[in-house]
Amino acid sequence: MSKQQAPVNKNDVVEVTIEDLTHDGAGVAKVDGYALFIPKALPGERLKAKVVKVKKGYGFGRVLNMIEASPDRVEAPCPVFNQCGGCQLQHMSYDAQLRYKQKQVQDVLERIGKITAVTVRPTIGMNEPWRYRNKAQVPVGEREGGLIAGFYQERSHRIIDMDECMIQHEENDKVIRQVKELARELGIRGYDEEKHRGTLRHVVARYGKNTGEIMVVLITRGEELPHKKTLIERIHKAIPHVKSIVQNVNPKRTNVIFGDKTKVLWGEEYIYDTIGDIKFAISARSFYQVNPEQTKVLYDQALEFANLTGSETVIDAYCGIGTISLFLAQQAKHVYGVEIVPEAISDAKRNARLNGFANVQFAVGDAEKVMPWWYAQGVRADVIVVDPPRKGCDEALLKTILNMKPDRVVYVSCNPATLARDLRVLEDGGYETKDVQPVDMFPWTTHIESVAVLELKN
């Protein structure tokens, strides 16, 4: 179908019924079989939409007026929901979000993975799905001569200046407000991305939800931080719980937030938090799950699926700072963790020592290279756990798992599409998907975490 053949043109107004939702939360309507994607519309709704873009085979629209609203529609409580790109689903009731996430996982398992024998469990949600994030990464800029800090507008690098975010912990909001106020007062310039000038690029606040400890990270374009001494004193005075104030220097013209150089300006290099009974040291650049309450739910589910009795050897691929490894070590005979990022492995070893685990061993490298080496050394894994990034497992890693033939594979996923793709590879290699459990780690967003378990067929 060419653009000329599309049954709609740009700026047309059409009356449609929303049939479904996409993976990024947009409503799907059909006009003579032509798909129209309409953000912030819900299944079952009848509405008038303006066509804003026409492409080959599909187009985009925006809601003009609602004719019949869904019973799942709610008033978004956040005043900047329609501008900010942080949340996508505040117009949808929380129960409906949980059903949507379960359906998304079920649909992609069937469509991409051709896995039809498994019924995905209902999504495990939060009792209090607000204020859950323990980390805020806030871009800083300038507008009309004044410093601003907030979050990016959806699909742009335009900063929405804000003092509060309803999914951030209140302590993080307080840090951002105080630093923004102090920087304005002291005349510290925000970063101009286009011209690559100004001082303060980002403010990062990290909060240990179970310890109350706070870290403030100031990411600057250069080494120089004007009024550094005064700024540190004032931050410490304004935020009594602060345990660490850190500067990270990022001189590059890049979208990457952190630079290579990090130095402690005041206090400790680490703050601490706990998930369950396990304590974790968190540095400025450590990867640590942003919703510790649901992380425990996710890891407890992974443990249940691993079905450990105390006699098993477990490999944790993509182990990060050792969060899942240490959970597994509570019930396994021995755990081997592998991760490509050297700093993460340093943190993992530190966390193992911190908690007194002697049955964990960590290695730096590509899992698909390290695991065959372990196998050659006589390591036989009963269970392999994978927790890959959004792109899913490396093809070579999946081959390695199939060669090692563990009894069970536990797959922790942050992307249902790559989960489905990888489960298909494992099923074709002799495994059977037994169970899939979505966990809502990021309420009010379209992000979906889930954990699946596969067992080796006879």
Swiss-Prot record:
What is the originating organism of this protein?
Halalkalibacterium halodurans (strain ATCC BAA-125 / DSM 18197 / FERM 7344 / JCM 9153 / C-125)
Name a GO molecular-function annotation.
Answer: metal ion binding
* One of the GO biological process terms: rRNA base methylation
Q: Does the keyword Nucleus apply?
A: no
What positions does the domain TRAM occupy? 5-65
Active-site residues annotated for this sequence: C414 (nucleophile)
Key word Transport present? no
Q: Name one Pfam family in it.
A: TRAM
Alphabetized UniProt keyword annotations: 4Fe-4S, Iron, Iron-sulfur, Metal-binding, Methyltransferase, S-adenosyl-L-methionine, Transferase
The UniProt record gives the binding positions of S-adenosyl-L-methionine as: Q289, Y318, E339, D387
Q: What class of enzyme is it?
A: transferase
Similarity field: Belongs to the class I-like SAM-binding methyltransferase superfamily. RNA M5U methyltransferase family.
For this protein, the record's InterPro entries field holds: MeTrfase_TrmA_AS, MeTrfase_TrmA_CS, NA-bd_OB-fold, SAM-dependent_MTases_sf, TRAM_dom, U5_MeTrfase_fam
According to its UniProt record, the EC number is 2.1.1.-
Q: Which residues bind [4Fe-4S] cluster?
A: C78, C84, C87, C165
What is the protein name stated in its UniProt record? Uncharacterized RNA methyltransferase BH0687
